[in-house]
Amino acid sequence: LAYKLSITPGIERLTEVCLENSRINADLYKELDIKRGLRDINGAGVRAGLTKISTINSFKMVDGVKTPCEGELYYRGIDIHELTDGFIGEKRFGFEEMTYLLLYGKLPTEVELTDFIKELAHQRALPRNFVRDVIMKAPSKDMMNTLARSVLTLYSYDSLADDISLSNVMRQCLNLIAVFPMLSVYGYHAHNHYNNGKSLYIHHPEKSLSTAENILRLLRPDKKYTSIEATVLDLALVLHMEHGGGNNSTFTTHVVTSSGTDTYSAIAAALGSLKGPKHGGANIKVMGMFEDLKKNVKDLKDEEEVGLYLRKLLHKEAFDKKGLIYGMGHAVYSISDPRANIFKGYVERLAESKGNDADYALYSMVERLAPKIIGEERHIYKGVSANIDFYSGLVYHMLGLPPELYTPIFACARITGWSAHRLEELINTDKIIRPAYVSVQDTKPYVLMKDRS
């Protein structure tokens, strides 16, 4: 049971003092040319490093003018469309193959892929009694905290935990990639049993199955799943596994890795970043928004009525009153998110197999209406499109994944990208990342205790 903590009047007073003395005039950021959020005035990220792991394009030069274009994403120089068409067309699961590509910079041969899958299967094991002693003993209501705690605890079981030689970090990364699904699903089962009073069941992973298949097998009481379910989950993992070095959690991995710390600490820091709702929780917000839409719109097939609800969202009159249509727009992409474009067709197939055609039709309507409405209400004409998280929550819902696991499943995918970037940082950089902060605090004299007010 959680022990009770409360915000006392004393803490409230201390908070007021902190606010009074810590606010910074927003005009100073512009005056001193400070890149807030490490972005320039147009929202583009400042150049903080080099990478070969992935490439993101959202603009092209046309007659010397920077012009928005259809979004492009490349893993190790290969277009994501070609990659997904390749492994799906050849009837393979893609997560393991794309993990090999991102870590090692080349597509594996058939023999190399077979050996790599065997290596991941070998690594898919936790220390003896780890589930009982670590995961079950202190279940948390938040699976990201459970996941981070489990990762940090694995440090204690590793006799070479602080060895940051490339081969040892490779071993650690492969192990974490392999066990993340187990840590996530087992953490949920512990929470669901001890906090929600539900039945507890722990299934062991099957070595012959893919990562996506094992996630579904571990999660479900009967261990059963369909081919389309596994295919769509595998695709979701592939599309979430890497997105450049500048996203918050991957940049966190670079920053913490540059200090020379161990792999477990670096990945736990990345998990802390991904837990933040501004980074990893977008699909949950999308699901909540659609639930609110269904409650407040009488005819879900009426474009005018749905459009009116979307305008209310933008005017802070609906859902969480934040003025956002969740799942629309992206920090990098404007005209289109290539991941969403790839995902959409498979989401439709899954919806058909589940009898969720009406939900899919509603999502498609919102995706079609929202850009025009956002343009009209916000006077944004550079282009706004659905991002990958617009559909991922619906997919996880149709797969029967509980909302508590939405962000951990994201982590099960992105651990590959974090690992690739940690290795790249170790290989290429020997300087600790240390950006500058400009002090805007006026100097003042020391005041004796008896003279303070």
Labelled PLM ranges:
Residues 2-453:
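Non-transmembrane, aqueous-exposed alpha-helical and coiled segments at domain scale
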